[in-house]
Structures are given as structure tokens and as C-alpha cells.
Amino acid sequence: MNQSYGRLVSRAAIAATAMASLLLLIKIFAWWYTGSVSILAALVDSLVDIGASLTNLLVVRYSLQPADDNHSFGHGKAESLAALAQSMFISGSALFLFLTGIQHLVSPTPMTDPGVGVIVTIVALICTIILVSFQRWVVRRTQSQAVRADMLHYQSDVMMNGAILLALGLSWYGWHRADALFALGIGIYILYSALRMGYEAVQSLLDRALPDEERQEIIDIVASWPGVSGAHDLRTRQSGPTRFIQIHLEMEDSLPLVQAHMVADQVEQAILRRFPGSDVIIHQDPCSVVPREGKRSMLS
């Protein structure tokens, strides 16, 4: 695992924790001053943000540790556990928003000064957009599942802050139940994001194969190599930033072992150039044994 990956992922986790802490302080004041249930919803979400981002920070540092005798494949799955924990945090906040929104829908309470809430929400919106932009850049560079989960969480915050602005504006003109209705809508969106995030984390923990596009790229690389007659048993998975790729290459029976090994090494290097940092295992099979084993070439 390269140093660049660790540096970028750690910075993203630290930035998220710092931003969530700042926004929490701002929203505590805004809720105390206005009494807005939508701002209370945002405040609770910021509390969840801090817990999730702190979890991310600790887990990311653990996942960056190199493989050892007890963890031969590294600690990358810790990122998936962090994403799963985040989905649980977010689901809890969504439930709280439902209950609070229903309470204020039944008994609406006028806000003291919606103008202050509007200003605070605009500041929160700008700060969150900056953070999401940085996280998106980090995800493009690292493909970190933990940072991607955090980014999806803060993307929902952008939507939430936009909805809060609209709710505050409507409340300003006397639509006091709009505040509670938007809190319910925000809760639904947050719950959806949490379920999607949890599903992706579970799939990673269950060793889901790489996307079809990436597997096809691997097959195309193998098919383009001289000396390779076919291939079968492509197996892939991902743990943290590391892709694990296994494939059997079919070669002519008459090919010397040294040359077959050389071809396999060249294919491995080609795959690593396309997917840096991957763990690639290649097995060479004589063409004559493939039909007897009941295998079917992926290149035919």
C-alpha cells in the first residue's frame, strides 16, 4: 500500500472530522436561537457526522497497517467495517428525525428568527460542498470505500441543507408545518443513503467480485498477450484499496516451463500497470488438460 494512498485517506478523514465539529457548534447556536426542528435535524446529523468521521479516522489508520503473520491479506477490510458502522449511525439519526418530525407536525411551533437559521444553513451548505469536493477528489485517486461512504453521507447533508433553506423560507411566511415535513423528508433520504451504504459494505465483506468493466479489462489484457491460448477461473475481490486477482492461463503443451513462467510474469506486470497495488496470482495450465478438467476458456 503506497504512502500516497495513506496520506490522502488520512487527510480526508481528518478534514471530515474537523468540518463536522465546526458545523456542530454553529448548528447548536442556530437551533438554540431559532427553535427550528429542521436545524435540530441538521444538528443531530452533525453529531452523527462526528461519530462516523472519528470512526473512519481510527479505522483508516488501522487499515493502513501492512500485512502481518495473523493478517496475510492486510487490514483493508476494516474500511468496509467502517462503512457498515456508518450506515448504522446514519440509520439511528434517520429514526430520530422521523420521531421529531412527527412530533412537530402534530404540534407545530413557530420559529423565533428564521433569518438566523437561513444564514447558518447557507454557511453549512458552502462548507459541506467544499468538503464533498475534496472527498470526491480523494476517492478518484484512492478508491477508498471508507472515504466514499463518508462522501455519500456528506452528499446527503448537502441535500438536507438545501431542504432546510426551503423549509425556513416557507416558515418565514407562516407555513410552520413545512419545517416538520422537510424533517420527515430528510429522514427518508438519510435512511435510503444508510441502507445503500450498508449494502455496499456487506457486499465487500462477502468478497463481491470486481465490477464487470474491470474484469473485462483483465480478460482483454490476457487475450492480447502472445503465447496465451486461453484463460479460465478468473476470481477477483477487493479489500480496502487492494484488488485481489487470480486467473489461470492456458498455454501450448510444448512451451518450455521457463518461457511459460516468463509469459505469466509479463501478463502479471501488464495487469499491475492497469491496476497498481493489486495482488495478482497467475497459474499456467497446458491446453491439453483444460478440457479434461471441464474448464471453458474465457477467450473463446
From Swiss-Prot:
GO CC terms, sorted: plasma membrane
Keywords: Cell inner membrane, Cell membrane, Ion transport, Iron, Iron transport, Membrane, Metal-binding, Transmembrane, Transmembrane helix, Transport, Zinc, Zinc transport
The keyword Chaperone appears for this protein: no
Domain of life per record: Bacteria
Reactions listed under catalytic activity: Zn(2+)(in) + H(+)(out) = Zn(2+)(out) + H(+)(in); Cd(2+)(in) + H(+)(out) = Cd(2+)(out) + H(+)(in); Fe(2+)(in) + H(+)(out) = Fe(2+)(out) + H(+)(in)
InterPro entries, per the entry: Cation_efflux, Cation_efflux_CTD, Cation_efflux_CTD_sf, Cation_efflux_FieF, Cation_efflux_TMD_sf, CDF_Transporter
GO molecular function: cadmium ion transmembrane transporter activity; ferrous iron transmembrane transporter activity; metal ion binding; zinc efflux antiporter activity
Zinc found in the keyword field: yes
One GO term (biological process): intracellular zinc ion homeostasis
Gene3D superfamilies xref list: Cation efflux protein transmembrane domain (1.20.1510.10), Cation efflux protein, cytoplasmic domain (3.30.70.1350)
Entry binding sites for Zn(2+): D45, D49, H153, D157
Annotated transmembrane regions: 12-32, 39-59, 82-102, 114-134, 156-176, 178-198
Compartments, record wording: Cell inner membrane
Membrane topology of the entry: Multi-pass membrane protein
Principal localisation: membrane
Primary role: Divalent metal cation transporter which exports Zn(2+), Cd(2+) and possibly Fe(2+). May be involved in zinc and iron detoxification by efflux.
Subunit composition and interactions: Homodimer.
PANTHER family documented for this protein: CATION-EFFLUX PUMP FIEF, MITOCHONDRIAL METAL TRANSPORTER 1-RELATED
Family membership: Belongs to the cation diffusion facilitator (CDF) transporter (TC 2.A.4) family. FieF subfamily.
Stated name of the protein: Cation-efflux pump FieF
Gene that this sequence comes from: fieF
